[in-house]
Amino acid sequence: MSVFSQLAESSKQNPFSLPVRSGNCASAVSAPGQVEFGSGKYYAYCALGGVLSCGITHTAIVPLDLVKCRIQVNPEKYTGIATGFRTTIAEEGARALVKGWAPTLLGYSAQGLGKFGFYEIFKNVYADMLGEENAYLYRTSLYLAASASAEFFADILLAPMEATKVRIQTSPGAPPTLRGCAPMIYKAEGLTGFYKGLPPLWMRQIPYTMMKFACFEKTVEALYQYVVPKPRAECSKAEQLVVTFVAGYIAGVFCAIVSHPADTVVSKLNQDSQATAGGILKKLGFAGVWKGLVPRIIMIGTLTALQWFIYDSVKVALNLPRPPPPEMPASLKAKLAAQQ
């Protein structure tokens, strides 16, 4: 039985979707002693893995993120990574490099909950809707649809803290702490101040997440098929986690490229309360939206690899089922053989 057959079967017990029918998960997916695949507990643990993977990694790279944002909003002053670090330390001291750590931790933990938790749910539900054979044939489209759906909701959780973080990091007059800056934004702009950056945030994060999940899933599939000298089932958990890290880094490089223009707009938009996305794009031009791409590739590549590594490690630690790369269903093999 293929992984998507197992996904479809386990989705029948999914408590989050009424149309899904009842069924039992194959033992190949949920081994004895493991959390039941597709259960509410499984999704809750996946969401916890997302909280840890996104919250920890984004908070760890706050200094690089701060410099990246400053390059985007003030490229005349912050001309590069090294210059950005030197200028920030010289003018504000080393402690300034961790500005925005609190909204980063809270915002991206919430986003990770939605990103990974909802992805697992949507992937299972969409696989059940497609059926076993179509879920295999159109698995890339399934990954793209599930990740886009998950990120749509995850960004609603992220937007308020992202707006606060960027204001702290890039606006000289803004309070340097979450408890000081968030009330200031609310007093001056109301709830709109926290969510005015949501559309460009979707523009940045949805393509990013679609690339992140689809590229990761396909890269893992390719690595086990063409690079790793033995089947996944014969690899140790440590070896599997190495494959996860490599696939995550490759996915991260592509993620950074497809989402960078929108990331620049988000940074500019949250810096200036009077700015609009259209006005920023017109002012920056094509070349301007690519400012800060190199540090973002370094940041996002490392970030994505670590996120997948942490997420997969959480699954291992919590004894969650980790289905192998998909295989062609036996029914589809029979149809193809009959056509030859």
Swiss-Prot record:
Any single GO BP term: phosphate ion transmembrane transport
* Annotated localization: Mitochondrion inner membrane
Q: What cystine pairs are annotated?
A: none
- Enumerate the Solcar repeat regions by residue range: 41-125, 138-222, 239-317
Q: Where is the transit peptide?
A: 1-27
Q: How does it sit in the membrane?
A: Multi-pass membrane protein
Q: How is this protein annotated for GO cellular component?
A: mitochondrial inner membrane
InterPro entries assigned: Mitochondrial_sb/sol_carrier, Mt_carrier_dom_sf, SLC25A3/Pic2/Mir1-like
Q: Does this UniProt record's set of keywords contain Disulfide bond?
A: no
Sorted alphabetically, the keyword list is: Membrane, Mitochondrion, Mitochondrion inner membrane, Repeat, Transit peptide, Transmembrane, Transmembrane helix, Transport
What's a Gene Ontology MF term here? Answer: phosphate transmembrane transporter activity
UniProt cross-references to Pfam families, sorted A to Z: Mito_carr
Q: Where are the transmembrane segments?
A: 47-67, 95-114, 141-161, 200-220, 241-261, 297-317
Q: What does this protein do?
A: Transport of phosphate groups from the cytosol to the mitochondrial matrix.
State the family named in the UniProt similarity comment for this chain.
Belongs to the mitochondrial carrier (TC 2.A.29) family.
State the protein's name.
Phosphate carrier protein, mitochondrial
The organism of origin for this protein? Caenorhabditis elegans
